[in-house]
Amino acid sequence: MNIFEELKARGLVFQTTDEEALVKALTEGQVSYYTGYDPTADSLHLGHLVAILTSRRLQLAGHKPYALVGGATGLIGDPSFKDAERILQTKETVLDWSQKIKEQLSCFLDFDNGENKAELVNNYDWFSQISFIDFLRDVGKHFTVNYMMSKDSVKKRIETGISYTEFAYQVMQGYDFYELNAKHNVTLQIGGSDQWGNMTAGTELLRKKADKTGHVMTVPLITDATGKKFGKSEGNAIWLDAKKTSPYEMYQFWLNVMDDDAVRFLKIFTFLSLDEIAAIEEQFNAARHERLAQKTLAREVVTLVHGEAAYQQALNITEQLFAGAIKNLSAAELKQGLSNVPNYQVQAEDSLNIVDMLVTAGISPSKRQAREDLQNGAIYLNGERLQNLDYSLSTADRIDNQLTVIRRGKKKYAVLTY
């Protein structure tokens, strides 16, 4: 199976400009290709991982990747399938985000070894050197307004309004392809399927300005079995930066994917062979309640993104919280595992009597209910049942002298911090 066949088998090929010519190029020699990442935030997220890992698969097959950070295009904003104009960031912010994205990409692509080692480029380097007049004369003249208006990404914004700034975005992205081809002989661009219009602007410019043929391959935008956009949990993006989304949160995200998605995601997001995935699928289908596919997915992706130690920690937090063994975890681990739990900052004037604290921290709605909860054995202090109505919290109840965990029943938690 050649690399293109494997990408197809994994569900990673959505659309290509000329499949036959692309397969020929990929099987007959080394292809230089690029994927672009606009710095629209200070971290990449799971949605970016599809293109990143596709790029890595091609590199492992002997092809040479260029990772383009859009220091210039990030200042403009891509209108593709956005309902409204993006808020423009300052140059300083975009340059800072560009640097952080570069660092993240180096975790996935090999920038150090072999003749096909990855290269990092930033389109700010060339756009900052070209004048507006030169850009209009040398690049803009190759694009008709009719051609630009025909793009779906533009059509969807015509009625609500699109600025000239965003309208010109596709020309800038097209010039990226031309520039990389001229300097590095890049002949293939990879991106999400929503980028098709912008990406083919590059092949059009190559054809008109240099009489060369470029290839485009898009990867699908991933949705779950219900059609919901992939990569978000409770409306929040799952970031690749551990400071924004902890390894534990990422582990839980993968652990909770639906059965109908789990095997498909193993093909897309892991480097397990297709034969290994087929074997996992067989075991998974025989005993879905054991969630083998989800557990494998969580292990593989968290290890890939954050490393083995972070995966082991996420697994340990999961197991200890499930067992209610709060004292087996450090304060740092509890902050990861209980990041979505209500947090109460204990004040100097607060009563430390357990009945009072249950009400103050929002665990019980009233003192009467708090007493009943204690008497009924529903209250747990750092994982241990507490029934003493006269108990007062002390420094001995603080894990790592930082926090105390109170639970009512099985699921209602509060974290007290000091």
Curated annotation (Swiss-Prot):
Subcellular location: Cytoplasm
Keyword ATP-binding part of the UniProt annotation: yes
Primary residence: cytoplasm
Catalytic reactions on record: tRNA(Tyr) + L-tyrosine + ATP = L-tyrosyl-tRNA(Tyr) + AMP + diphosphate + H(+)
GO biological process, any: tyrosyl-tRNA aminoacylation
Binding site for L-tyrosine: 34, 169, 173
Molecular function as annotated in GO: ATP binding; RNA binding; tyrosine-tRNA ligase activity
PROSITE patterns, A to Z: AA_TRNA_LIGASE_I, S4
Signal peptide: none
UniProt motif ('HIGH' region) ranges: 39-48
Residues that, per the record, bind ATP: 232
Protein EC: 6.1.1.1
Domain of life the protein comes from: Bacteria
One Pfam assignment: tRNA-synt_1b
UniProt entry keywords in alphabetical sequence: Aminoacyl-tRNA synthetase, ATP-binding, Cytoplasm, Ligase, Nucleotide-binding, Protein biosynthesis, RNA-binding
Domain S4 RNA-binding: 352-418
Motif ('KMSKS' region) on chain: 229-233
Cellular-component GO terms for this entry: cytosol
UniProt-listed InterPro entries: aa-tRNA-synth_I_CS, aa-tRNA-synth_Ic, Rossmann-like_a/b/a_fold, S4_RNA-bd_sf, SYY-like_C, Tyr-tRNA-ligase, Tyr-tRNA-ligase_bac-type, Tyr-tRNA-ligase_bac_1
Role played: Catalyzes the attachment of tyrosine to tRNA(Tyr) in a two-step reaction: tyrosine is first activated by ATP to form Tyr-AMP and then transferred to the acceptor end of tRNA(Tyr).
Family, per entry: Belongs to the class-I aminoacyl-tRNA synthetase family. TyrS type 1 subfamily.
Alphabetized HAMAP family for the sequence: Tyr_tRNA_synth_type1
Protein name, entry field: Tyrosine--tRNA ligase
Native source species: Streptococcus equi subsp. zooepidemicus (strain H70)
Lineage, broadest ranks: Bacteria, Bacillati, Bacillota, Bacilli, Lactobacillales
Gene name of this polypeptide: tyrS
